[in-house]
């Protein structure tokens, strides 16, 4: 489905796609929680494909998965599968065996900050952001705020580099900046891809379990008409939440399409 179609159908349901502010907050909060930026080693990278079964972490609620290093300490016989020699495939949950001893359970999906596959599997086409790339705006992210105002944030113009810095600022924007090139294990441990052709939408999350694709990864190389089996998005809601008067009233709610 194209960005344009996903945007239309989500709006028809009173929803939107996950947006730039939401993704930035997820990244920043995950860094704050774990005190590191390499979320693929912290929470695992997941199975190395873009066709994972949704709901693989549902039985564990919002508990985050763990990565290879932490799982290995508990069980040194876990699957050791490196992707491109850089990142460990799969993720694990801490558990107990029948004798009460600590063990781990391997899963295909990752869960980071309570979000299943917030990176890997499929790209998230983001709402409320694009790169106009017109005169004077090369590489600038145009971000629509919840109140309708627009901010222009200058990002880096070099494509295919490992991220070494982000704009941050008042809104803690995860917009890649600078001209240095990092690596899969330094700085933000993820990559940025950009086209300076006019009007590019922005994807986050990456696909597969590539080392380049954690919570700070961004791809601003496609227009709104692009479609692919490994590109999708997430429904999100911004607005006023009203408490139902009763359980019966809540159950009586019907989707407005």
Language-model-detected regions and their locations in the chain:
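Disulfide-stabilized, aromatic/cysteine-rich ligand-recognition loop
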Residues: 1, 8, 14, 18, ...
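Short aromatic-cysteine micro-motif
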Residues: 1-118, 257
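Generic structural signal for well-ordered beta-strand positions
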Residues: 123-124
């Amino acid at each position: 489905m194209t960005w344009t179609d996903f945007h239309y159908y989500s709006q028809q349901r009173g929803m939107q796609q996950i947006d730039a502010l939401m993704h930035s907050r997820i990244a920043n909060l995950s860094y704050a929680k774990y005190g590191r930026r390499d979320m693929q080693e912290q929470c695992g990278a997941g199975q190395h494909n873009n066709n994972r079964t949704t709901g693989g972490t549902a039985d564990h609620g919002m508990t985050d998965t763990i990565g290879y290093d932490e799982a290995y300490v508990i069980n040194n016989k876990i699957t050791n599968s490196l992707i491109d020699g850089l990142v460990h495939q799969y993720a694990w949950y801490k558990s107990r065996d029948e004798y009460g001893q600590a063990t781990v359970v391997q899963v295909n999906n990752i869960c980071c900050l309570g979000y299943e596959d917030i990176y890997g599997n499929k790209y998230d086409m983001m709402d409320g952001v694009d790169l106009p790339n017109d005169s004077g705006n090369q590489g600038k992210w145009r971000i629509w705020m919840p109140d309708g105002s627009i901010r222009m944030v200058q990002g880096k113009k070099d494509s295919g580099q490992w991220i070494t810095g982000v704009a941050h600022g008042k809104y803690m924007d995860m917009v890649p900046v600078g001209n240095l090139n990092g690596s899969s294990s330094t700085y933000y441990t993820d990559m940025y891809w950009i086209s300076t052709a006019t009007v590019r939408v922005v994807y986050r999350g990456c696909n597969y379990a590539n080392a380049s694709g954690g919570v700070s990864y961004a791809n601003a190389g496609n227009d709104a008409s692009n479609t692919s089996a490994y590109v999708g998005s997430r429904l999100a809601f911004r607005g006023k939440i009203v408490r139902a008067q009763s359980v019966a009233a809540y159950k009586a709610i019907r989707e407005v399409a």
